[in-house]
Amino acid sequence: MDFSIKGCDWSKGTANGFLTGKSDCIVLGVFEAQTLSGAALDIDEATKGLVSRVIKAGDIDGKLGKTLFLHEVSGIGASRVLLVGLGRQDAFSQKAYGDAAKAAWRALLGTKVVQVTFTLAQLPVPERASDWGVRAAILALRNETYKFTQMKSKPDAGAPALKRVVFSVDPADDKAAKVAAKQAVALANGMDLTRDLGNLPGNVCTPTYLANTAKKIAKDWGLKVDVLGLKQIQALKMGSFLSVAKGSVEPPQFIVLQYRGAAAKAAPVVLVGKGITFDSGGISLKPGEGMDEMKYDMCGAGSVLGTMRAVAEMGLKINVVAIVPTCENMPAGNANKPGDIVTSMKGLTIEVLNTDAEGRLILCDALTYAERFKPAAVIDVATLTGACIIALGHHNTGLFSKDDALAGELLDASREAGDPAWRLPLDDEYQDQLKSNFADLANIGGRPAGSVTAACFLSRFAENYPWAHLDIAGTAWKSGAAKGATGRPVPLLAQFLIDRAGA
């Protein structure tokens, strides 16, 4: 799909190209109380009041998400007009813009429209310019067109009729909007990869499959990749990671993917992704109902790989390292047992009180390994705890960090990207819940504040650099009729790296 940008100030008579240019459809916004957007006012004038007459007739009331097509419109170059309800003008927000864009794309994708002129990016979203509107609209469109059908006997290969979108933006935002469009396409491609990896079944998306995916990213985009196998992992004395992996016949993989967009001496940002490609719970077996969704327990790894692909396509001037420890968590005669004590790469001993708290056991060794890169920051991403879902539901990703500056950067990025996160506490008092009578620490801290104690566990292995933990258990996938991976938190991570790179 092709996206292009054209500057236009609808209020100053510079819209003639949009009025007369050939297009299958032009998209206009309509607020409640019969208030037209700037573009809609100009089109209304060019069509001798057609838009106003339609609104006064009650065919569209401006409520958020309502749409109406006008056909065979005279006075303009577009053969159709799509009116999109924007809701109340005084309540128009970032979310309302996203909902309006989504409604527009859904309406358009149900037609044979090939080329569309999209004016909504210029709507007055508080604290957002039209370049932001372009990016959000492209991501909304790509979300609407995403399909996962490759595992069906007859995959749906049908492509939408829509092939070209022309965005009208404020002239001052023209250059920034072109950058935003490029970044949005790269981000959408990274999110699609993340969603594909999450949606694949566990018998396909194995640790070896993830490793091969990393190799393909490296080959396609010129990155450096190292995949460590069992013997190399053993040589590094990653006893905690290996204790989880040993219960499965699938061999563990330890993936290191490096993107170098800045000077070699520049300290990298390290992203660590939990890669449990299927989590049965191990000996602490999960209930059968809903266990199929434990194929999504590698979404931390998937989001890290998707982010790396997006960063490479954007060409950001920053160094980034992705680390993915990946294995299955399965019950077997040689699997971890409750009460076992294992030794981590750092040398700390861990009492495994619950084998279903395995994510932290593989991440802790990866966090220790990250030290060798002398990182500017380390961010781990994991579907770590059901407790985070209880605390935050399915809207906000849980953010934990003792570094206020790093946490602030991530929260700013989450707001800019529309990929919300919420900071939760990481006070030292919670560490007491991880005490063990027999080892340096236990892998669980009881029911109270389960997401916090999980983050506290990880913090023991991330003391030598700025560190943050993202718990995506509630945001990495959806259940029910809309079951599927979401691609989150790729937008948050990518925006954080864009900001760090100054792009």
From Swiss-Prot:
Cellular location(s): Cytoplasm
GO-annotated molecular function: manganese ion binding; metalloaminopeptidase activity
GO biological process: proteolysis
Residues forming the catalytic site: K286, R360
Cofactor(s) required, per the database record: Mn(2+)
Binding site residues for Mn(2+) 1: D279, D356, E358
Record keywords, A-Z: Aminopeptidase, Cytoplasm, Hydrolase, Manganese, Metal-binding, Protease
Name of the protein this chain belongs to: Probable cytosol aminopeptidase
Native source organism of the sequence: Burkholderia pseudomallei (strain 1710b)
